Amino acid sequence: GVQKTVVEAPSTVSAEKMYGFLLDMDTVFPKVLPQLIGKSVEILEGDGSVGTVKLVHLGEATEYTTMKQRVDVIDKAGLAYTYTTIGGDILVEVLESVVNEFVVVPTDGGCIVKNTTIYNTKGDAVLPEDKVKEATEKSALAFKAVEAYLLAN
């Protein structure tokens, strides 16, 4: 099955700077949220471009240890970036993959980050709504922490 969430987050960070973060999140996240994305990011295949597969070692504040991601879209002109979580213990029993699509839309005085998350479950399994809500809330907290970091740097 498929479950989907769409979140739009306004920011006073410029669209260019916010998109730059998306492209560089592997180095920024451990600085901003070491307790979540703490240890390291290993490139397993590729050079950072579309098709790259990486293994993210998660921090102590999460119950999971690893997340395997594949880069699917890098559209610098359209300020779009998509990656899919394809492995690691973060994919709980019912999940096959999780697609994260980001589009940064410039606004007067900042941007809006549109984040669509698509949960692909095994067969007709359903991810419990509280898990979806928890993931959405964690993403919002991470976004606020990143925004504060980008505004300060």
From Swiss-Prot:
Pfam families: Bet_v_1 (PF00407). Keywords: Allergen. The keyword Plastid does not apply. The keyword Mitochondrion does not apply. PROSITE patterns: PATHOGENESIS_BETVI (PS00451). Transmembrane segments: none annotated. GO terms for biological process: abscisic acid-activated signaling pathway; defense response. InterPro entries: Bet_v_I/MLP (IPR000916), Bet_v_I_allergen (IPR024949), Plant_def-hormone_signal (IPR050279), START-like_dom_sf (IPR023393). GO terms for cellular component: cytoplasm; nucleus. GO terms for molecular function: abscisic acid binding; identical protein binding; protein phosphatase inhibitor activity; signaling receptor activity. Belongs to the BetVI family. May form dimers. This is Allergen Pet c 1.
